[in-house]
């Protein structure tokens, strides 16, 4: 199929990369039923990035004749006998009005319909927005039959989340399959050992027990199948050694627990000053938050993983929000410039605590936002300035949703310095949403 450059002004440019098929027409019927069939209208419309119904309707509007495009068969018919050159000239006018950018002339545009029912061409090359003349007859047809829009950033984000969820489900299914294989291998092992014992008892074979090397060889052969490991050494010395190791681990844990219990009363004695509430004379201990922060710091300094930290805090009597506030103080206390980068770096600890909040029935994302606000109210000015970067980073990581962020912002006090720093990000979110709706 012969190709030509898109746009009459680029006809002689041998290196022009935007091309479309040369128009091919065929006269069908006779008398009053004579029609012109544009044979390759689907290919032309695809090259222009416009629905074939638009170009067919444009021919009908300009020629004052009835036109019809059949979606099922892909046939484009215009009543009457028309020359190919005449239709090609009309197609060039369509390209100038509805395809080429009014700024740079490139055909990399898409049709946008604004809220005021106006048509615009958005150029992907230069970003220019071209206003289409709404006096043209085809504009009303386009408004009634809008083009299919590309997926917005919100749709892409939901697709990314669905893909991550699919991967998690696949990993869980693989893990379940591995467990089933291990169970089948263990049952097979038990059956084989049972039959061998029966044979030995029948023959009354008093041979010595298997050597350690034989058992190791058998264990190595079974490790090739799904990494199944079996206890091989059943001698008295090995059993005593294992008992000593277990006892040493248990005693070490008991010693650590006893030292922690001994340290707690000392800390309470040292931090005994009491604080008086502003709205009453009742005295409450000031160090409840600090005790929780110190406990988390001890866990972090001992190299606890996010899962271990979650397990340790699950037994604490503090409510979920108090735990989140204490975690921020323990993780980022004293942080100034670079607060946003530190939050993203240690996001796994935040996710672990959010999971614990969800298990307790508390709103996890709202608790995280409240924790950020509470920390920034007490943090340094440099850290408080980065609160918008923190929330945007968590939003980009799919930890926070747009709806929850806006809800948290609307519930807060707008005069708060933290919310003032977040305002530009909220405006950006709302503008991005309105632009996606317009598109």
From Swiss-Prot:
The modification Phosphoserine is found at residues 434, 436. Residues 283-439 form the W2 domain. Residues 214-228 have a biased composition (Acidic residues). SUPFAM superfamilies: ARM repeat, Translation initiation factor 2 beta, aIF2beta, N-terminal domain, Zinc-binding domain of translation initiation factor 2 beta. Gene3D superfamilies: 1.25.40.180, 2.20.25.350, 3.30.30.170. It comes from the Eukaryota. InterPro entries: ARM-type_fold (IPR016024), IF2/IF5 (IPR045196), Transl_init_fac_IF2/IF5_dom (IPR002735), Transl_init_fac_IF2/IF5_N (IPR016189), Transl_init_fac_IF2/IF5_Zn-bd (IPR016190), W2_domain (IPR003307). The modification Phosphothreonine is found at residue 232. GTP binds at residues 29-36. GO terms for molecular function: GTP binding; translation initiation factor activity. Pfam families: eIF-5_eIF-2B, W2. Residues 147-186, 234-245 have a biased composition (Basic and acidic residues). SMART domains: eIF2B_5, eIF5C. Keywords: GTP-binding, Initiation factor, Nucleotide-binding, Phosphoprotein, Protein biosynthesis. Residues 143-245 are annotated as: Disordered. Belongs to the eIF-2-beta/eIF-5 family. Catalyzes the hydrolysis of GTP bound to the 40S ribosomal initiation complex (40S.mRNA.Met-tRNA[F].eIF-2.GTP) with the subsequent joining of a 60S ribosomal subunit resulting in the release of eIF-2 and the guanine nucleotide. The subsequent joining of a 60S ribosomal subunit results in the formation of a functional 80S initiation complex (80S.mRNA.Met-tRNA[F]). This is Probable eukaryotic translation initiation factor 5-1. It comes from Arabidopsis thaliana (Mouse-ear cress).
